[in-house]
């Protein structure tokens, strides 16, 4: 899995670099950027009985690179590559005891945005939207109570067989959805950005032992980030 992710990452970076080099030759306006920020993520959906999930937001982070490729006046294609943390928190009362759960899932994410970047004052307005795809790389679930505390790693697979180990938490490896961005880039190339994200894939796997499982889990959230463009 890690070798496959590394190969995909290398191919994406190579494609972005070659495309950027071609556009730099012709227009001189393609730019690379670095970006890092904070996420406020949640997992929405339904439990195995079809009841709405009641989760709380988890604070995470994201860091990565992107490139702006001009496609028309004030419009850019902006692919990126991010390492980002998603997940959620929840509190449950079972037999009179309170348990706090935290799910943390790390992804390598590829956003593909169309960016509108007109002049505004001494800088540029940033408005964009587009799809994203992401691959899970690691994660864990921690559960704490008054007399107990345990942590389990997340294993990524689409289907869970009856014979699979039960000492891990299973999640589907792929996530995908839509995102929107709004922000401002100052004259010194520093930018501030707000982003929102809506996951469209169910990241809960299928369990062979639970044919009537109604669980649906989708990533959603928003965040703030700072960037610098070269």
Where does each model-flagged region fall?
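Glycine- and aromatic-enriched membrane insertion/assembly motifs of diderm outer-membrane
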Residues: 52-98, 189
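Predominantly the C-terminal beta-signal and adjacent terminal strand-loop region
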Residues: 166-169, 175-180, 185-230
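Short glycine/proline- and aromatic-enriched beta-strand/turn motifs that initiate or cap beta-hairpins
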Residues: 21-64, 122, 145-147, 161, ...
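Repeated loop/turn-to-beta-strand initiation elements of outer-membrane beta-barrel proteins
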Residues: 75-77, 123-125, 188-194
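Flexible, solvent-exposed loop segments that connect beta-strands
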Residues: 43-55, 85-105, 137-171, 203-217
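Residues that define the transmembrane beta-barrel architecture of outer-membrane proteins
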Residues: 28-30, 57-61, 104-110, 174-178, ...
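Outer-membrane beta-barrel channels and translocator barrels
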Residues: 27, 72, 119-122, 187-189
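Transmembrane beta-strands of outer-membrane beta-barrel pores
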Residues: 38-42, 83-87, 109, 118, ...
